[in-house]
């Protein structure tokens, strides 16, 4: 599985066990990702921060 890094078009290969790509962004600025990468479990959204997770190649 390959997930985008914070600055596309760069990406990295996920280590074993981290089989989800995720994108974290502030609710106030949904078009500006704060963090991207590989993760094992999708975190819960909060009032300020949202997470978008998926299990396909480079979809974050």
Swiss-Prot record:
<keyword id="KW-0800">Toxin</keyword>
<feature type="disulfide bond">
    <location>
        <begin position="54"/>
        <end position="59"/>
    </location>
</feature>
<comment type="similarity">
    <text>Belongs to the three-finger toxin family. Short-chain subfamily. Type IA cytotoxin sub-subfamily.</text>
</comment>
<dbReference type="InterPro" id="IPR054131">
    <property type="entry name" value="Toxin_cobra-type"/>
</dbReference>
<dbReference type="GO" id="GO:0031640">
    <property type="term" value="P:killing of cells of another organism"/>
</dbReference>
<dbReference type="GO" id="GO:0044218">
    <property type="term" value="C:other organism cell membrane"/>
</dbReference>
<protein>
    <recommendedName>
        <fullName>Cytotoxin 2</fullName>
    </recommendedName>
</protein>
<feature type="disulfide bond">
    <location>
        <begin position="14"/>
        <end position="38"/>
    </location>
</feature>
<feature type="disulfide bond">
    <location>
        <begin position="42"/>
        <end position="53"/>
    </location>
</feature>
<keyword id="KW-1052">Target cell membrane</keyword>
<dbReference type="InterPro" id="IPR018354">
    <property type="entry name" value="Snake_toxin_con_site"/>
</dbReference>
<dbReference type="GO" id="GO:0090729">
    <property type="term" value="F:toxin activity"/>
</dbReference>
<dbReference type="InterPro" id="IPR003571">
    <property type="entry name" value="Snake_3FTx"/>
</dbReference>
<dbReference type="Pfam" id="PF21947">
    <property type="entry name" value="Toxin_cobra-type"/>
</dbReference>
<feature type="disulfide bond">
    <location>
        <begin position="3"/>
        <end position="21"/>
    </location>
</feature>
<comment type="function">
    <text>Shows cytolytic activity on many different cells by forming pore in lipid membranes. In vivo, increases heart rate or kills the animal by cardiac arrest. In addition, it binds to heparin with high affinity, interacts with Kv channel-interacting protein 1 (KCNIP1) in a calcium-independent manner, and binds to integrin alpha-V/beta-3 (ITGAV/ITGB3) with moderate affinity.</text>
</comment>
<keyword id="KW-0204">Cytolysis</keyword>
<keyword id="KW-0123">Cardiotoxin</keyword>
<dbReference type="GO" id="GO:0005576">
    <property type="term" value="C:extracellular region"/>
</dbReference>
<dbReference type="InterPro" id="IPR045860">
    <property type="entry name" value="Snake_toxin-like_sf"/>
</dbReference>
<comment type="subunit">
    <text>Monomer in solution; Homodimer and oligomer in the presence of negatively charged lipids forming a pore with a size ranging between 20 and 30 Angstroms.</text>
</comment>
<keyword id="KW-0472">Membrane</keyword>
<dbReference type="InterPro" id="IPR003572">
    <property type="entry name" value="Cytotoxin_Cobra"/>
</dbReference>
<keyword id="KW-1015">Disulfide bond</keyword>
<keyword id="KW-1053">Target membrane</keyword>
<keyword id="KW-0964">Secreted</keyword>
<dbReference type="GO" id="GO:0016020">
    <property type="term" value="C:membrane"/>
</dbReference>
């Amino acid at each position: 599985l390959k997930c985008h890094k914070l600055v596309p078009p760069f990406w990295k290969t996920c280590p074993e066990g981290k089989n989800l790509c995720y994108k974290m962004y502030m609710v106030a600025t949904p078009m500006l990702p704060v963090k991207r990468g590989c993760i094992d479990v999708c975190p819960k959204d909060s009032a300020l921060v949202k997470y978008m997770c998926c299990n396909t190649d480079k979809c974050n």
